[in-house]
Amino acid sequence: MSVIGVSEGMGVMLGEKIGSTKGQTTMKPLPAVNGLLVMESVEIGSGTIAGAEVTVMATFSSSMRANGSWYGECPNSGVLMAADGVATGTYSATGAPTADGGFTFRGIAYFETVAPSL
């Protein structure tokens, strides 16, 4: 997962990459809605966000759309843990399956924190 964004006090431009994390993703099917798949994804990993080493945990719910694309969201169930505190996140994105059996999503993430490093 790459994090691209802007923070008022960081002096970065909108769309500038401010960090990335790598880890494992596990998925499980949830009950279908109107015959379309719904999946839950749990991501656990680590990396660097805004120069701080972090551990990331997030639970997403992704729903297939009638045109084959996907919409995913993580409403207040994303966590970044740094040495000096935590940040909670809300994510939403659209995506599509990849040729190798995975998925790719593009979207937005909002974080709230009192950790000085984040």
Where in this protein do the model-derived segments appear?
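Beta-strand-enriched cores of mature, soluble protein domains
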Residues: M1-L118
